[in-house]
Regions:
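Conserved non-cysteine loop/helix-boundary elements of the Radical SAM core domain that shape
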Residues: 1-42, 49-73, 99-110, 170-171
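Short acidic/polar active-site loop segments enriched in Thr and Asp
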Residues: 2-3, 43, 82, 153
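A cross-domain feature marking catalytic cores of carbohydrate-active enzymes
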Residues: 8, 44-50, 83-88, 136
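Auxiliary Fe-S-binding modules of radical SAM enzymes
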Residues: 63, 71-225
Length: 225
């Protein structure tokens, strides 16, 4: 076992968790498990779901708890969280969204503008987390391109199989390497392959000879798996 993904964090604020998902564990438990994994030398990531009706202060509290734990682990010369990924709660045609609409004290949902603002704030606030990932499976390629301009430097992976976002009713849960490279290139960046530790790998030019890739020269490297 090499790593432990950071899914399940959602919102590390107890009042929000109790209202939205009372059967899930306390936020402290998520942080404890991730810290144990980090102390064992496993590669870990941190996640955040917004749009539960939480306040801006709740969102900052989530970021603060991640940053504080990252500070503790970095003092031990360990990498801690290699990346941070946020996305809005998915309320499309799934039973979760239908069942809870109007049933909670929180009004749910977060649009593209709110998401992009959160990406930008995350990049500024989490100064000790090296990489911010854009969430194209939940936001689509167009918004993911804008997220790269808002502070994200990682486009994630092609995801040959995905069972969480797809179950929520969204339709875009896989992409070819050509699609990812093209989106990154059109946003003005250079696509670069990586592994889960963010070591850069040889990157074949999936756009070679493609007229669709004719645009401005790339400005900065963007990671992709």
């Amino acid at each position: 076992m090499h790593g432990l993904p950071g899914g399940g964090a959602e919102m590390l604020v107890e009042d929000v968790r109790k209202d939205v998902s009372p059967k899930k564990g306390h936020p402290d438990n998520w942080l404890r498990v991730m810290k144990e994994a980090q102390l064992l030398g496993l590669t870990t990531s941190a996640t955040n779901v917004i749009g539960f009706g939480e306040t801006n202060a709740d969102r900052v509290q989530h970021l603060r708890r991640i940053r504080e734990q990252q500070d503790e682990v970095r003092k031990l010369n360990l990498p801690g969280f290699t990346s941070f990924i946020a996305w809005p709660v998915q309320l499309e045609s799934n039973t979760f969204g239908k069942r809870n609409r109007g049933q909670n004290k929180f009004e749910r949902g977060a649009g593209p503008t709110e998401y992009l603002r959160h990406v930008a704030i995350s990049r500024l606030f989490l100064d000790n987390v090296d990489h911010i990932q854009a969430s194209w499976p939940t936001m689509g390629m167009g918004i993911a391109q804008m997220a790269l301009l808002a502070g994200a430097d990682d486009a994630g992976s092609t995801m040959m199989e995905e069972n969480v976002v797809s179950a929520s009713g969204t339709t875009k849960f896989s992409a070819t390497e050509f699609e990812l490279q093209l989106s990154i290139h059109r946003a003005g960046f250079l696509p670069v392959r990586r592994n889960s530790d963010y070591d850069r790998l040889d990157t074949p030019d999936a756009l070679a000879g493609s007229p669709e890739a004719m645009c401005q020269p790339p400005l900065h490297a963007v990671e992709l798996v």
